[in-house]
Amino acid sequence: LSSIDIHTDWVLLGLGILTILSYLFDLLAKKTKFPSVILLVLIGILFRLYCDTNGLTYGVLEDILPTLGSIGLILIVLEGSMELSTEREKLPLIFRALFSALVIMLLTVTALTLLFYYLFHMGFYISMINAIPLSIISSAVAIPSSLGFSKKKREFIIYESSFSDIIGIILFNHALANNPLKPEIFFKFGFEIIVVLAVTMLCSFLLIKVLKRIEHKIKYFLPIAVLIILYALGEMVHVSSLMMVFSFGLFMANSRTLFPRFIRKYCDHDQLNVNLKQLQMLTGESAFLIRTFFFLLFGFTIMVKEMGNFRLFLWGAIIIAVIFIIRFAYLRISTRGSITPEVFIAPRGLINILLFLSIPAHLASSVINQYVLLIVFIFSLFLMIWGGISWKKPRSGKEIIEEVGEISSTL
């Protein structure tokens, strides 16, 4: 056999089975804190092994990975941002998450750049380009994994991982476009944020009005389609596309507080709440499906025979150590009270893979390759598992009273 020639019925059967397996993996993840993405990647690796063993080729399967990942990133960040509240009392949490994402990102990029420069003798600019994708927290993995945590810790994880994605993409795009980095890019960055927020606010308001008027039963894919268009246009002109997605979700979920008063009075907030619930459900279902096949395909790109090199695991372990030492030090200094589990919730995943695949060939490193990325990805997930297992959710006053009552009744 020189190519995969499978009947349509078998393809449909396989897609259905894989979707059900992913659903079961998600259920398992909620019970055991074991990330479902590891199992999805493993299935992809096994399928690649089967194809290579039987001499099968796989056409465009690898080529669609970046597109699938971009759509998944849009949906996951949108889903997470629509769950957030921007009430006044949330501002300290938002700023804490923003500074955490920014400071940890800059410190990690600096440390990894110096590590690659001195240890692997890579050029400084190439070291920085390869360090940035490894320094970003993947919201696509962190957000679904925070479901079992307290509301405050979950909100911090959603904000921090989303900010990390946004800052990382902006930094990566500007690093690619500006060699060397110039001071004026920071002014450009500030102007870019203002423009992105203004455009997103306008689009959010227009979509709210349009959704109210649409009577057709199929209407909730419209805002997703608009976001995909905005994301693609943003990528073409090198502006923060992910910030558009994140701020769009915030504007939709917090129209009463984020819209200026002269816009707010034209919004039907009750109808918007109904539309928002439907949009959240559609986004969550779609994100689940896209995420499933993205990580399956990522596993499919891995060749097992390349994983036998011990140095790959050594480099991966060193990178993970740098990432989490910096994270622990910052959170310990900046946070009062417990820093568990959030100190362990810094997974690598979808966004890291997407940025890594977009590094131009002349800036790619033969040392920091996709196999090192996979090892960092897996190590970070196991640390996240440890964080989830070691953290115990505080009991509510009602639960304590009920337990005391049960004990008293036995005396």
Where on the chain are the PLM-derived regions?
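Transmembrane helical cores of multi-pass secondary ion antiporters/exchangers
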Residues: 1-411
